[in-house]
Amino acid sequence: DLKVGVVDIGRLLADSPQAKAAQIAIESEFGPQQRELENRENELKARSEKAQRDSVAMSDAEREKLEKELRDARRDLDRREQEFRDDAQAKSRVETQRVNKVIFEEIKAYSKANGFDLVLTGGLQGGVLDYRESLDVTTAVLAQLQAKYKPAAAQPMPQPKPPAKSN
């Protein structure tokens, strides 16, 4: 008899503590920079609106100088935002690959430990459209991921080695 299981990778990516921790790490790393960029965007918008209101009272030279400053500031902000997006996306890809590796290793370990001949992917991201609920092993794999998860803060700090004794 062929023993078959189906696992919903999307659910594991959404619900595993490893994936949630990766998302929190990305948000904590990039959140402050995102807020700074949003503040700069708001400041630039306010400067632009003020310049538009005040432009009537300016000379042509003053208006052109201010418009150039605003264009330069916009270009600089656009460049910073693009760099931020690139950095955040790169970090997200790295974290996603790391979490995927952990999840796939856990699926393989579960499959081997429970004597499965074949484990397929189901759910929205999978290749199996319809299957009996009795074939779904997602909850069991998720339980193993949860059991093996150790938050970074909970891991013991390496202890310094005692100084070498000199004779």
Where are these regions (language model features)?
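A structural signal for short loop-to-beta-strand junctions that line the ligand-binding cleft
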Residues: 127-131
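A generic structural micro-feature
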Residues: 112, 133-134
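Amphipathic alpha-helical segments
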Residues: 1-114, 118-126, 148-167
